[in-house]
Structures are given as C-alpha cells and as structure tokens.
Amino acid sequence: MKILIGLDASTHSERVLDFVARMRWPAGSRVIVLSMLQPVASAVTGAYEPTVIPAENLEGLRAQLEELVADAERALREVGFSTEGRVLAGDPRETLLQVAHSERADLIVVGSHGRSGIAKMMLGSVSSHVVTHAPCSVLVVKQTGRAKEGGKEPRP
C-alpha cells in the first residue's frame, strides 16, 4: 500500500503522524511524507497574493519543513515503514493531489484543523478539497478536544 501523508508545521501534524504510526497496515506499505512551501494567502479574501518573501525567510521555512519531514520519516521507519520525504513549493491542496496522481497513492492522510464557519469559508480547507478531488481514498485525522486543550489523546 502506498500512503501519502500531508504535514505542515502545526502541532496537529504530530497527531496525523502518530495516527499513521499506530495503525496496522499491509506488510510492505510505503509512506511518502509531504510538506509544502505555500504562497502567502490574504487573511481577508483567502486569495493567494504575489507577496515577495525574503530569501532568508524562505530558506528558514524550507529548513524547518525539511526537518519536520526528516523527523517524520525517522519515526515511521522505527515502526517498520519504507519512507520517502519531500518538501515541495505550491498550494497544498493541488500539490497533494498532483503527488497522489503521479505516485498512484492508495491513500492520502491529512489532518483536520477544526476550522469552521467564517474561518473555513475564508481560508478554505485543504482536507475538504483533497477529499473532494482525490484519485484515491482519503483519511482525515481529526484533532480531538483533548488535543486542542493540550491533553493526551487516546490511542487510535
């Protein structure tokens, strides 16, 4: 089974990774850990704006995401997965779908950040877009109330 995991720099990504690591998967399952450098979105319209990000900030963000992906790969290898990590530039919604298509993923795993109402409408939802347009099944890992409050979550 080929599993594509979308991670970002949020604490909820830890929940996604932990969920995948604890589940039972077919022998020989391979995980692609993907994180995206994304364009800056306007908080008012949700539209992507051509904002120039200073090179040193972009390099710092890329380094942070590469470390996140490397840590995720290590954690997954410890529990027996074959892994590959990537940091790509682009809109997370479209990048996840493109990689799922090109890699012929069997499953995409993403987190739900719990946005609702106006925030969801303005900012959009990566998980909703991926669920709607994915070429394969999608598992959305919800952040529970205990995790939002900083408590320990039950085992999936």
Model-derived segments and spans:
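Acidic, proline/glycine-rich short linear motifs
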Residues: 35-67, 146-156
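Short, solvent-exposed amphipathic alpha-helices that sit
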Residues: 19, 63-72, 95
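Structural beta-alpha unit
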Residues: 22, 74-108, 145-156
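General small-molecule cofactor/ligand-binding pocket signal
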Residues: 32-34, 84-88, 139
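Small/aliphatic-rich secondary-structure junction motif
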Residues: 1-52, 81
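Phosphate- and divalent-cation-binding pockets in alpha/beta enzyme and binding domains
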Residues: 15, 95, 117
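Gly/Ser-rich helix-loop-strand patches that form or flank binding pockets
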Residues: 98-149, 156
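Active-site-adjacent beta-strand anchor residues
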Residues: 6, 86, 111
